[in-house]
């Protein structure tokens, strides 16, 4: 019911040890979880955190304040630095893009137009450009495509009234596919 704080745990599975390590506690609605090769990103009502492991030591750094429901990490503007694409609040109605500059993330773009209960993120590459796909469960229940070009960020609708709960992008035999677990027939 999310009324109590949660925690982030790691388990040392070496030699079937199953040793539990508490990484963070007192995180409310720690629902967002995104993994890259370098880090794990955790969204919660306490903010957005980056978890790394170096020399068997966990490090947890707060990147953003405020209620962050979920996150996707992607170099969407193709400048060599990953942006943070977030859902403001858990299952919220605002998508924000943060760009890093001098070690600090700054909001560059917000999208709130007719979206409610934003639920799913996945990233992909189309025509040699990084893009992010977004599933919206209520309101217009669209599947959205976020992209960046010479004049900024753009959000386009790929599908309407389907309410994707999960999305997955894959390239097979040089063809791009977006899989969607929809709660409504299109």
Q: Model-found features: residue ranges?
A:
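Beta-propeller-forming repeat regions
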Residues: 1-186
